[in-house]
Amino acid sequence: MERLLIVNADDFGLSKGQNYGIIEACRNGIVTSTTALVNGQAIDHAVQLSRDEPSLAIGMHFVLTMGKPLTVMPGLTRDGVLGKWIWQLAEEDALPLEEITQELASQYLRFIELFGRKPTHLDSHHHVHMFPQIFPIVAKFAAEEGIALRIDRQPLSNDGDLPANLRSSQGFSSAFYGEEISEALFLQVLDDSSHRGERSLEVMCHPAFVDNTIRQSAYCFPRLTELDVLTSASLKYAIAERGYRLGSYHDV
């Protein structure tokens, strides 16, 4: 049985080094899809690069934890900036859901303005769209707009609560991450998905060249290792041997 594999590189638009890494991993590797931060400092550079790489599917990386929002968000920003304190607000059940709904719509419209088309799918920076309070907002929005959504089904209590017309891959993995990045780890992710009987899988990745912005990230040099693995010719062959076809959210 042929299975669909979506290799999605997060953080398009974060920095020039990140952008170049994603393009390299698409052009000479197995990355088929990326998601863009429309408030990223290098988003214009990402748009420019994407014009020369039409095979790269581009979704939207919804941002609520970094940089400046596109709308006024007094309930989520500090000194006008987003940050990781969103976790505390979520634990206290104090998230400004109306502000988040408006920001999602604004980032979506900004994406269309930048790239000239709808995103292939939605996901989010630091997986905040999987917060129980935020997920229904994003799922409803994606279904209404007719675009797919990254879904990590482990935190979900009931798949039956999803909108009937919402598209996603059957499986999602964030396991290709950390200090032990290797080809063996990537293939283990595929084998685990196969054992679960999933016919489609998204694997998250973050290939990049290191620049000053990436150097400031807690997740820095493993991005280079990811790039090496994802552009390995042997990995592409091993994926095909396991019965996977590379694709994007256009295919779900």
Curated annotation (Swiss-Prot):
Magnesium as UniProt keyword: yes
Biological pathway: Glycan degradation; chitin degradation
GO BP term, example: diacetylchitobiose catabolic process
GO molecular function: chitin disaccharide deacetylase activity; deacetylase activity; metal ion binding
Catalytic EC class: hydrolase
Pfam families: YdjC
Cofactors (names): Mg(2+)
CDD domains: YdjC_EF3048_like (cd10803)
Entry's EC annotation: 3.5.1.105
Matching SUPFAM superfamilies: Glycoside hydrolase/deacetylase (SSF88713)
Catalytic activities: N,N'-diacetylchitobiose + H2O = N-acetyl-beta-D-glucosaminyl-(1->4)-D-glucosamine + acetate; diacetylchitobiose-6'-phosphate + H2O = N'-monoacetylchitobiose-6'-phosphate + acetate
Cellular localization per UniProt: Cytoplasm
Subunit structure: Homodimer.
Family: Belongs to the YdjC deacetylase family. ChbG subfamily.
PANTHER family named among the record's database cross-references: CARBOHYDRATE DEACETYLASE, YDJC DEACETYLASE FAMILY MEMBER
Function: Involved in the degradation of chitin. ChbG is essential for growth on the acetylated chitooligosaccharides chitobiose and chitotriose but is dispensable for growth on cellobiose and chitosan dimer, the deacetylated form of chitobiose. Deacetylation of chitobiose-6-P and chitotriose-6-P is necessary for both the activation of the chb promoter by the regulatory protein ChbR and the hydrolysis of phosphorylated beta-glucosides by the phospho-beta-glucosidase ChbF.
Name by which UniProt lists this protein: Chitooligosaccharide deacetylase
Lineage: Bacteria, Pseudomonadati, Pseudomonadota, Gammaproteobacteria, Enterobacterales
